[in-house]
């Protein structure tokens, strides 16, 4: 499949079921290591989490047939990570999440386009800092975020291989 025919746009309420299906498949495929369970609260509440708040958004990548092959989301960071409590000025910090690309389409610039859209959105909504966490075991995840200008603030290591990263806008 060529990337030139793909459409990247903010999701709408009618996209929720297909985006949920895509995300749940990605989570099953990527978080299958023993003892790991992906957190899916936001997946089941996409509308409430990413569509209703004006300072949040989610984008999806669609094939011409309407199949979801990628996603990325921005929401206001809520100081939920215990190890980082108090680090961020909350009104000015956004959290990047749910950035996944179908395995057959990775390394073709789609993720970078999504990051560009998220960055533009964040600047328009007054965010000054982007926070995310990733895992060393995710294919291309950690290296991708470093190439996008994110810096490590905490590498937890351990079986979940969690790395916390940030980027100042």
Over which residues does each language-model region extend?
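C-terminal "cap" of GNAT-fold acetyltransferases
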Residues: 3, 25-29, 88-92, 128-131, ...
């Amino acid at each position: 499949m060529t990337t030139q025919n793909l459409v990247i746009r903010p999701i709408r309420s009618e996209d929720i079921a297909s985006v949920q299906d895509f995300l749940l498949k990605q989570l099953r495929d990527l978080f299958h290591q023993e003892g790991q369970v992906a957190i899916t609260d936001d997946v089941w509440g996409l509308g409430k989490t990413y569509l209703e708040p004006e300072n949040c958004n989610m984008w999806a990548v669609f094939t011409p047939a309407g199949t979801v092959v990628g996603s990325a989301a921005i929401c206001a960071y809520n100081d939920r990570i215990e190890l980082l409590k108090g680090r961020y000025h909350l009104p000015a910090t956004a959290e990047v999440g749910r950035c996944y690309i179908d395995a057959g389409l990775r390394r073709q610039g789609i993720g970078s386009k999504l990051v560009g859209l998220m960055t533009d959105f964040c600047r328009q909504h007054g965010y000054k800092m982007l926070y995310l966490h990733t895992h060393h075991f995710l294919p291309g995840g950690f290296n991708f975020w470093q190439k996008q200008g994110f810096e490590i603030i905490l590498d937890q290591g351990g079986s979940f291989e969690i790395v916390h990263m940030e980027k100042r806008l």
